[in-house]
Amino acid sequence: MNYLSSFGELLESFFSDKNQSENPKLTQAIEDAEKFNSWFSKTNIINALKYWMVKLRKDTLETWISKYSLQNVNYKVAVIMAGNFPLAGLHDLICVIISGNRAIIKPSSDDKILINFFVEFLHEKFPETNEIIEIASEKLGDFDKVIATGSNNTFNYFE
């Protein structure tokens, strides 16, 4: 959970200090995501990041997971992410991490910049997350469970 709350703290610092120059990587990711996907306005991206800023506060995470009996089963869970809004697949990824499993993610081609920023942040700050989260570059193969969101087209990953 510290991995996740650490990202929430990064976002809180980014937005509360109004000193965005202290995190040029996040500033660049926001700009790149807006340029890459014309459906993602800067306002939509900022709103999504602010949403996750609140949801990834340590107390909010603790309240959320306290309702569940979590078991560390260590499945390899493939997460095929939608890209219809900024960070659409982040909830699924967070659920995999919190439940004690490993994630192999296939970011949507429409929303890979922000998701990749999240994963790279975790990998840099917490090197042990390299064993927990993998970004797949090819068609997914070796997994125990799968979460697929998006349209009916998502089914094509399984044919």
PLM features: residue spans?
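N-terminal Rossmann-like NAD(P)+-binding subdomain of aldehyde/semialdehyde dehydrogenases
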Residues: 1-78
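Acidic-enriched, low-complexity/disordered segments with a strong bias for Aspartate over Glutamate
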Residues: 17, 32, 59, 92, ...
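Short, surface-exposed, charge-dense and proline/glycine-enriched linear segments
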Residues: 55, 95-103, 136-141, 158
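Conserved small-residue-rich beta-alpha loop and adjacent elements
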Residues: 61-125, 129
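Conserved NAD(P)+-binding/catalytic subdomain of aldehyde/semialdehyde dehydrogenases
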Residues: 76, 125-159
